[in-house]
Amino acid sequence: MSGVSCFWRSLLFVPAHVEKFIDRAHERGADACILDLEDSVPLAQKSMARQALPAAAAKLQARGLDVLARINSLQGGGLDDLEVISSPSLRAVVLPKVGSAEDVRVVAAVLERLELERGLAKGGIGLLAQIEDVAALPRLDEIASASPRLLGMSLGPEDFCVSASMEALPETLFGPSQQVAFACRRAGILPFGYPDSIALFTDLPRLRHSVLLARQLGMVGAFCIHPAQVAVLNELFSPASEDVEYAEGLLAELANARAEGRGAFAYRGRMVDPPVVARALELLERHRASLRRLAALDHH
C-alpha cells in the first residue's frame, strides 16, 4: 500500500463539470471529494470536465479536502483522462470497472511515467479500484495485489447488480461485499463501501443499517453521491469513544508487558495476541486520521 493516507470515512462524488457543486464541496463535511469524470458527466461535456479538473482539485485541496478523481473506464477514455488530470493536488485515482489485475497495472504504469515527467512525488497518487462486474469476483486477489499504488477496493453496487441480474439490496450485496473485504485484507489494502445501493440517499434509516453491516465487515469508509449521506458515514465509520479508550489501554498494557519481558498478557479478561494488537493499531490510526481531517477543515 502506498504512503498516501487513505482512512477516508466518506468520499463524496462531485461532477467535475458542475462548478457550483465544486465550490461548495468543502462545506459538505466529507473526508475526501471525488471529482467525477465518469457516470455523472454527460458524454458531450467529458472533455471540458477533464480540462477543468486540475484547477478544481487545486482549489479543493487549498480548502483542506483530500481530492481524488474518478476517471472513465480504460475502454472509455480513462488513459486520456490521466494525461490531463495528474497533478500535485490529486491524492488518488478511482478506477472504475476493474476486471483484472492488468487494468490496475496499466494505470499504475501511466501514473509512474507522469509523476516522473512532471516532477511529482513518486507513488504520491494512489489508486482505488471499483469492482463492478460479477466476472471480476474470481480475480479479486490478483486485483488487490496488482500494484503497491493500490490503496483499496470497493464494490460498485449498481453496475455489479446489473451484471449479476439481481436487486441492489443488503441481502444480495452482503456476500460479494464480504469477498471484496476479505481480498483487501489478504492483500494489506483497505476495503471501502457498504452492501446496498448508494443511490438511495433519502432513506437514512436504511443507510444506517447498511453502513453498520459494512462496519461489521471491516469496511473503513464508503463512497457517497449526496451530501445527506456524509454525516451517517462519518458517524458510523468513526471508531466509538469506548473502542478508542480500549485500544489505548491495550497498547499501554502491551508496552508494560514488553518492558517486563512478558510475551503474552491479558487485558480486561482477554488474552492479547498479535491480531488483536494490529486491530487496535488500525483503529487508533483511523481515529487520528479523522481528527486530523476535522482540524484541517476547521482551519480553512
Predicted regions and their residues:
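Expand to "…catalyze enediolate/carbanion chemistry for C-C bond making/breaking, isomerization
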Residues: M1-H300
